[in-house]
Structures are given as structure tokens and as C-alpha cells.
């Protein structure tokens, strides 16, 4: 007997969605068991958004739901059990235990330890009765002695820690959550909260939550047989929470699109109060497969006053955003260069800036340059022996650009000319610098509507994301080059 997931949803008629997910918890270990038990009839637990829409439709709680629906409203579908099948993405999620009480919908998905086709009788699914007991226990806890919305918010903020004791790994141990509350020594909601020693003050003003996702992509490209190109994405999620109260609670969910790359090696700030085990165990050392946890990644936390890094992560994206080759050959007193760059079709073609820096170390100043470029502009810094290819804000429709030419140098001055111990002879590189706003290579984003804030006032929530190049090198394929490996990119 176990539960795959549990939700608390406030019914809000007149709002665009007619409801808000106030709390949700998934149990990845139980989900893996469901995949094994159910076999070909397995239907995964959906994200909060699709579940909310499907449940409100099935319960006839949508404002615009006035038409007769045969599959739901016919006489053959009269429901007296509070157990439903939700049609989500063309598949039916069953059984879903759900009921409405005091404008709050309580719902859970019990584990069925057998195939779902044909559908087994309810009396044989022991998790259903446990699900009712679980939800009634949560209801009793939320509304026992509850007088106003602030007390309800406080109790909702305590649920993540309470369920760690009352329902670890989806298995209900004690439906009386008050027992777990006493065991964890929570302060009673009637007692004033104490100012924590690490929080030097409290915020007063308009509530707002700002979320910023920054991904940096590193790459070493060689265009050589026997030497593999390497690339790595490192992400940082930064938050600034201006919220009134001594101990406000916030839950932020990071989501991925269907074809997104799973997040790995996740490190979180100490203010994060709890995490699903699947988030902590996802590692870049493990081989990627279809069973890799792909979110949503939920981070409940009590924010400090200042801006802070909520978490760091890595990801193994299938291809680098820009592929290229660089060829440089010395011909008598000049260098002949050929460069080709191609933007991958899946990458957003809208840069804040994009440049290729082409340095020539251990040589004299540039005295003569002849070149031909298919796109962009070339700037010459003669004394620095540097070319900067300004690509601009977009690649052409072909997604491919090229630059070729010859460079002649004057006499070398050891005091002024750039020196590098690695780039000797024909060993050379070009380095890409670019930034793309409102985009991440993994597809990771923070859904503003899924942010849960347990504090007074309705905060303004903003979310931003960007992709930045970092140590993005393309080496001369006609000469030796230093070799790195994926594990060393960090």
C-alpha cells in the first residue's frame, strides 16, 4: 500500500484556471514500482498543470463547463465513490481519489500492484482505502482550530516536513499529522514565531519574487578523427524574495519541455527544506537513458533577505549550440585561415550579441589582411594581433557562415605583443562569445504560475533565463591542440 502522488487544490471560481495547486508531492520510488506493476497499462503521473485541468473538468468545477459530455455525464458514469479516471494526453490516469471540502480539493493517486487492463475491482486495490485515510488526515490537520487564511498558509507550509514522517516514500505510517507535528517540535500556530539567528531583519514593502536561470555552455572542438569534441552545460538558479514575515515559505518548480535534457549534479542552497530523492541522485556519471528523472524539480525553501543561488546543476545536452572548424596554415610570411560556423537548428536564432575572437599569439603586429566573409563584419586590432568577427544578433537562414583570408605580421616586440605558452607554431584557437536571452539550452524554465508563496500579500512573480558562452574554444585542426575530457570541463 502506497501513494504515487498527493495534491491540495484550492477551488477558485471566476479565475482563469478555476483553481490553484496549493501543495503537491510525488514519490519517485513508488512511481518506479507502478511502472513495473502496471506494465503496458502504466500511465505516468502528470505535472500539476495538466492534472489540475483534467481534475476540475472531471469534477465539473470549470466555469465554462456547461455542455453535456457523454464520457463523463452519461447515466452509465454516475460516480458514488469519489474515485475517478482522468483523461490526460490521450491516456486515462486511474484510480484518482478526490473530494471537495471547504473549497479545497484533496486528491491522491494510489499504487495499484497489478496490471490496469482489465481494470481490477476497487476492493482489490488496498491503496484506495489508505488514500482516503491519508487525505482525511490532511483535512483534519488543516482545519482543526484554523481561524483564518494566515493559519491555513502556515499549516500548508508545514506539510512537506510533516509528510517526511507521516508518509515517507509514499507509505502512510500515521494519518494523524498532529502527532508528527508534536514529534518535530513545530511551534504552535497560535504562538509567535521567533526571529532566526541567521536572518538579520525582516522585509517591509511590496512583495515580489524574482527568479533567474543562467546557463553557461563550455565547449572544446577539434574537427579531428580520434579526438572527440566535448561540451557541458552548467546552470545557476538565482532568487530574490522580497516577502513580509519572519519565516515566509516559497516553493519553486523548474520544468523541462518534452525534448529537454534532464538536470544532473544538483546542488542546493542550505535554505532548501526538502527534496525528492530522484533530484539528489541524478548524476552525470550515470549513463543517460529514458528513465532519467526529467522533473518537475521542486525546491521548497525559506528565503534569506538577500539575492542567493537557489541551486546549481549540469546537463548532458546532445549537441553544442554552435559547431565549427578552424584551419590555419603558415605559408611563407603569412598565415592562411579558414573558419566555418554552423548554428544548430534547435537553438534560438536571436542573440544579444555573438562574436568570434581570433587571437594570434607570439607574433608581431598585423601589417596586412585580406579576407572574405559570408556574413557579419571583421574588426582588426593590429597591435594586439587580434581579429574579432562580429556576427551580430542572427545567423542567416542557412544557419552557416564562413570566413577566409590571409594575415601578414610585422616584427615581433616582446614587450607589447600577446604571449601564450601553448599557442606556439600553428597551435591556435578561436573563442566564441555569445548571449541568448529568454532561452536555455536544456529547455529549463521556471513556471511563474507554479510558484507557491506562503506569506501575507500576493507577490509579483518574475522569471528570466539566458544562455551564455563560457570557455567556448574551436582549435586549429591543422596543428596539435590540448585535449580535454567531459569530466574536466567543470
From Swiss-Prot:
The keyword Cytoplasm applies. GO terms for cellular component: AP-5 adaptor complex; AP-type membrane coat adaptor complex; cytosol; late endosome; late endosome membrane; lysosomal membrane; lysosome; membrane. Keywords: Cytoplasm, Endosome, Lysosome, Membrane, Protein transport, Transport. Expressed in various tumor cell lines including Jurkat, Hep-G2 and HeLa. The keyword Membrane applies. Gene3D superfamilies: Mu homology domain, subdomain B. InterPro entries: AP2_Mu_C_sf (IPR036168), AP5M1 (IPR039591), MHD (IPR028565). It is a peripheral membrane protein. CDD domains: AP_MuD_MHD. One of its GO terms (biological process) is vesicle-mediated transport. As part of AP-5, a probable fifth adaptor protein complex it may be involved in endosomal transport. According to PubMed:18395520, it may play a role in cell death. Probably part of the adaptor protein complex 5 (AP-5) a tetramer composed of AP5B1, AP5M1, AP5S1 and AP5Z1. Belongs to the adaptor complexes medium subunit family. This is AP-5 complex subunit mu-1. It comes from Homo sapiens. The lineage of its organism: Eukaryota, Metazoa, Chordata, Craniata, Vertebrata. The gene is AP5M1.
Amino acid at each position: 500500500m502506497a501513494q504515487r502522488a498527493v495534491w491540495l487544490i484550492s477551488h477558485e471560481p471566476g479565475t482563469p484556471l478555476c483553481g490553484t495547486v496549493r501543495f503537491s508531492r510525488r514519490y519517485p520510488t513508488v512511481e518506479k514500482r507502478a511502472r513495473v506493476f502496471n506494465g503496458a497499462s502504466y500511465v505516468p503521473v502528470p505535472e500539476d498543470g495538466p492534472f489540475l485541468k483534467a481534475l476540475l473538468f472531471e469534477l465539473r468545477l470549470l466555469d465554462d463547463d456547461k455542455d453535456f459530455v457523454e464520457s463523463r455525464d452519461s447515466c452509465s458514469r454516475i460516480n458514488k465513490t469519489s474515485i475517478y479516471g482522468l483523461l490526460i494526453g490521450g491516456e486515462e490516469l486511474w484510480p484518482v481519489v478526490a473530494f471537495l471540502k471547504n473549497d479545497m480539493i484533496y486528491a491522491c493517486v494510489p499504487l495499484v500492484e497489478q496490471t490496469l487492463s482489465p481494470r481490477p475491482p476497487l476492493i482489490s486495490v488496498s491503496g484506495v482505502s489508505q488514500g482516503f485515510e491519508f487525505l482525511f488526515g490532511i483535512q483534519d490537520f488543516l482545519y482543526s482550530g484554523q481561524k483564518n487564511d494566515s493559519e491555513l498558509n502556515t499549516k500548508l507550509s508545514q506539510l512537506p516536513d510533516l509528510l517526511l514522517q507521516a508518509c515517507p516514500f509514499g507509505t502512510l505510517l500515521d494519518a494523524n499529522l498532529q502527532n508528527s507535528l508534536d514529534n518535530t517540535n513545530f511551534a504552535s500556530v497560535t504562538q509567535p514565531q521567533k526571529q532566526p539567528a541567521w536572518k538579520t531583519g525582516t522585509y517591509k514593502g511590496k512583495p515580489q519574487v524574482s527568479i533567474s536561470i543562467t546557463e553557461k555552455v563550455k565547449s572544446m572542438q577539434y574537427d579531428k578523427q580520434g579526438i572527440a569534441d566535448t561540451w557541458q552545460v552548467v546552470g545557476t538558479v538565482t532568487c530574490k524574495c522580497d516577502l513580509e514575515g519572519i519565516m515566509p515559505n516559497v516553493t519553486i518548480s523548474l520544468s523541462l519541455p518534452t525534448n529537454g535534457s534532464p538536470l544532473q549534479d544538483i546542488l542546493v542552497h542550505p535554505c532548501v527544506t526538502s527534496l525528492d530523492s530522484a533530484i539528489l541522485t541524478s548524476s552525470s556519471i550515470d549513463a543517460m537513458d529514458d528513465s532519467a528523472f526529467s522533473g518537475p524539480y521542486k525546491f521548497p525553501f525559506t528565503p534569506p533577505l538577500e539575492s542567493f543561488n537557489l541551486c546549481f546543476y549540469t546537463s548532458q545536452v546532445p549537441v553544442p549550440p554552435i559547431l565549427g572548424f578552424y584551419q590555419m596554415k603558415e605559408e611563407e610570411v603569412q598565415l592562411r585561415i579558414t573558419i566555418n560556423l554552423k548554428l544548430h537548428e534547435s537553438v534560438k536564432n536571436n542573440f544579444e550579441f555573438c562574436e568570434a575572437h581570433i587571437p594570434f599569439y607570439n607574433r608581431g603586429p598585423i601589417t596586412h589582411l585580406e579576407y572574405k566573409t559570408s556574413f557579419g563584419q571583421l574588426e582588426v586590432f593590429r597591435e594586439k594581433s587580434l581579429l574579432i568577427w562580429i556576427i551580430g544578433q542572427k545567423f542567416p537562414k542557412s544557419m552557416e557562415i564562413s570566413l577566409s583570408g590571409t594575415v601578414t605580421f610585422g616584427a615581433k616586440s616582446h614587450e607589447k605583443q600577446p604571449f601564450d605558452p601553448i599557442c606556439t607554431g600553428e597551435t591556435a584557437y578561436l573563442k566564441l562569445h555569445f548571449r541568448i536571452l529568454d532561452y536555455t539550452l536544456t529547455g529549463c524554465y521556471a513556471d511563474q504560475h507554479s510558484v507557491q508563496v506562503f506569506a501575507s500579500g500576493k507577490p509579483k512573480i518574475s522569471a528570466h533565463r539566458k544562455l551564455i558562452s563560457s570557455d567556448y574554444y574551436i582549435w586549429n585542426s591543422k596543428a596539435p591542440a590540448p585535449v580535454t575530457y567531459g569530466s574536466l570541463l567543470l
